[in-house]
Amino acid sequence: MSTMTDVGVPETSRPSNAKPWYKVLYIQVLIAIVLGVLVGWLSPHLATNPWIKALGDGFVKLIKMVIAPIIFCTVVSGIAHIQDARKVGRVGIKALVYFEVVSSFALILGLVVGNLLPVGHGLAAKPDAGAVAKYVDQASHMHAVDFFLNIIPESVVGAFAKGDILQVLLFAILFGFALMALGERGHRLRDVIDDTAHAVFGVIAIVMKAAPVGAFGAMAFTIGKYGPAALGNLIGLVALFYATAALFVFVVLGVIAKFVGFNIFKFLGYIKDELLIVLGTSSSESALPQLMEKLERLGCSKSVVGLVVPTGYSFNLDGTNIYMTLATLFIAQALGIELSFSEQVTILLVAMLTSKGASGVTGAGFVTLAGTLAAVNPALVPGMAIVFSIDKFMSEVRALTNITGNGVATVFVSWWEGELDHDRLHANLDKTIDPSDVETAVTTG
């Protein structure tokens, strides 16, 4: 059974029963990708058939369909519930400051690595001229003043109808603060928005069932049109993302852990069961209740855990941040689009906003990428099909990095607030966790 968290995303109380291997989404997508590679390699003519291409494009459109409502619901709910931070004094502000600083590190790290190791160069992917023409024409007439004025929608309905991410974000931010100001009078409306978010994520769950079909179509078309050499670029992106995420966890989060007074490797060992749950579901949210319980046992105060962890699932997704900047640069390189320094700075600024609309559910990172591309340079949007085929392989690492980042964030804010029990922290990290404790963590919620 699922409930809603404070940030308006569904909370899974425990992992589902084991499925037969052929029903596991990861296996289905893997098989679909292998079949797509074979079809694209052995029969390029068939692979480039419009109907095959439509499988991948159709799935991307299904994802784009829910971008606006997802961003609206999660941002509004996240801001509206921040009023709870008043009950715990400075914790809310400290958490948000931490989120912004560390998220910026993650975004910048992805951007730096993507520039130093441009694995997308040489792919020479070219989307259909018709698909790109309207974006290019639109961009050529867009000046800086027009860009900022365009953020303001002429109507709220129009913003959602066009799927303009920045316009939806602006309205969501204003609406969230207005709802927060209502206090208890806005309680019922917050519940409605939370329930709406739950339903929208249910739509994503349905859409994700078509992921194997979309992966097959996207991979078959990519290999059929660009040749087997495209695999090298795609594998390069996966490897680069894995290495960058590991660098972030062991260096950036490791330094933060060292500053507080604990070892990042021992912390990873402490939450190993939650990490395994996340690895199997590709969703950092699947282990949320267990993580909260373990952090309390680790010595973090209940009030800090109750605020920082749920809020972090909308405002502190480090793995998603790294993915967004890396994937955006990869797509630009693959399409032969040179991004200037100012455009790359824009990526950072836009990603800081769009990442706040990401949640810890499977596929949310890809949804957020779509929003970032649409806001930065719509001409990049058709390139989403290039990375979709391998998105599943990056989803697990995104989720693992996200949950680790939120765990470290909670310990840090507890320490900053002076509410971290160092004796319990070291007692738990320096010992082997009793099996009964693990069982308690898994069944809590």
Curated annotation (Swiss-Prot):
<dbReference type="InterPro" id="IPR023954">
    <property type="entry name" value="C4_dicarb_transport"/>
</dbReference>
<keyword id="KW-1003">Cell membrane</keyword>
<dbReference type="InterPro" id="IPR001991">
    <property type="entry name" value="Na-dicarboxylate_symporter"/>
</dbReference>
<feature type="transmembrane region" description="Helical">
    <location>
        <begin position="370"/>
        <end position="390"/>
    </location>
</feature>
<feature type="transmembrane region" description="Helical">
    <location>
        <begin position="105"/>
        <end position="125"/>
    </location>
</feature>
<keyword id="KW-0472">Membrane</keyword>
<dbReference type="GO" id="GO:0070778">
    <property type="term" value="P:L-aspartate transmembrane transport"/>
</dbReference>
<feature type="transmembrane region" description="Helical">
    <location>
        <begin position="201"/>
        <end position="221"/>
    </location>
</feature>
<feature type="transmembrane region" description="Helical">
    <location>
        <begin position="163"/>
        <end position="183"/>
    </location>
</feature>
<feature type="transmembrane region" description="Helical">
    <location>
        <begin position="24"/>
        <end position="44"/>
    </location>
</feature>
<feature type="transmembrane region" description="Helical">
    <location>
        <begin position="237"/>
        <end position="257"/>
    </location>
</feature>
<dbReference type="InterPro" id="IPR036458">
    <property type="entry name" value="Na:dicarbo_symporter_sf"/>
</dbReference>
<dbReference type="GO" id="GO:0015141">
    <property type="term" value="F:succinate transmembrane transporter activity"/>
</dbReference>
<keyword id="KW-0769">Symport</keyword>
<keyword id="KW-0997">Cell inner membrane</keyword>
<feature type="transmembrane region" description="Helical">
    <location>
        <begin position="322"/>
        <end position="342"/>
    </location>
</feature>
<comment type="similarity">
    <text>Belongs to the dicarboxylate/amino acid:cation symporter (DAACS) (TC 2.A.23) family.</text>
</comment>
<comment type="function">
    <text>Responsible for the transport of dicarboxylates such as succinate, fumarate, and malate from the periplasm across the membrane.</text>
</comment>
<dbReference type="GO" id="GO:0005886">
    <property type="term" value="C:plasma membrane"/>
</dbReference>
<feature type="transmembrane region" description="Helical">
    <location>
        <begin position="62"/>
        <end position="82"/>
    </location>
</feature>
<protein>
    <recommendedName>
        <fullName>C4-dicarboxylate transport protein</fullName>
    </recommendedName>
</protein>
<dbReference type="InterPro" id="IPR018107">
    <property type="entry name" value="Na-dicarboxylate_symporter_CS"/>
</dbReference>
<keyword id="KW-0813">Transport</keyword>
<keyword id="KW-1133">Transmembrane helix</keyword>
<dbReference type="GO" id="GO:0015138">
    <property type="term" value="F:fumarate transmembrane transporter activity"/>
</dbReference>
<keyword id="KW-0812">Transmembrane</keyword>
<dbReference type="Pfam" id="PF00375">
    <property type="entry name" value="SDF"/>
</dbReference>
<dbReference type="GO" id="GO:0015366">
    <property type="term" value="F:malate:proton symporter activity"/>
</dbReference>
